[in-house]
UniProtKB/Swiss-Prot annotation:
Gene coding for it: AMELY
Coiled-coil segments on the chain, per record: none
Protein name: Amelogenin, Y isoform
Biased composition (Polar residues): 108-117
Role played: Plays a role in the biomineralization of teeth. Seems to regulate the formation of crystallites during the secretory stage of tooth enamel development. Thought to play a major role in the structural organization and mineralization of developing enamel.
GO process annotations (BP): enamel mineralization
Length: 192
């Protein structure tokens, strides 16, 4: 529909311009500010008001969408802990089987995540009791899985190599090296 409106505006503007009375006259149709300014205004109206940087709005919105959904699930798991600690507990459940290297992301984490670690063993134990029936052997790992859901988004760029990656051709082809000229011991530089 927008293209039809634009077409109608341009068609009306073309018919409103005076055409030369006879073919020898050098008549030019001046598409100046009278036509181009409303056209630019119309094109700006069609665009989104936000800049189209694909990663900024999506990354920010994904973080905000995950936390409310998890906080709605968190009162079902354990209602005694604050909501800041519970959003990490449901996110641990799919992550624990995937990541055996949880101490490494814990070392890269920020200090707010370290504040979550002392408070999470109780909700984490209660949330893990239905799935694995061995909560006590996993107690050292339970403070570390909350670190991983926050670190889960940065490790996703290494995940796309699951698809078969073709090795890039070398920039310089591998050519056999030519033999170096023999050096005399008298002309060789001294190396200390």
């Amino acid at each position: 529909m927008g293209t039809w409106i634009l077409f109608a505006c341009l068609l009306g503007a073309a018919y409103s311009m005076p055409l030369p009375p006879h073919p020898g006259h050098p008549g030019y149709i001046n598409f100046s500010y009278e036509v181009l300014t409303p056209l630019k205004w119309y094109q700006n109206m069609l665009r989104y008001p936000y800049p189209s940087y694909g990663y900024e709005p999506v990354g920010g919105w994904l973080h905000h969408q995950i936390i409310p959904v998890v906080s709605q699930q968190s009162p079902q798991n354990h209602a005694l802990q604050p909501h800041h600690h519970n959003p990490m507990v449901p996110a641990q459940q799919p992550v624990v089987p995937q990541q055996p290297m949880m101490p490494v992301p814990g070392q890269h984490s920020m200090t707010p995540i370290q504040h979550h670690q002392p408070n999470l063993p109780l909700p984490a134990q209660q949330s893990f009791q239905p799935q694995p029936i061995q909560p006590q052997p996993h107690q050292p790992l339970q403070p570390q899985p909350p670190v991983h859901p926050i670190q889960r988004l940065p490790p996703q760029p290494p995940l796309p190599p699951i698809f078969p990656m073709q090795p890039l051709p070398p920039v310089l082809p591998d050519l056999p090296l030519e033999a170096w000229p023999a050096t005399d011991k008298t002309k060789r530089e001294e190396v200390d």
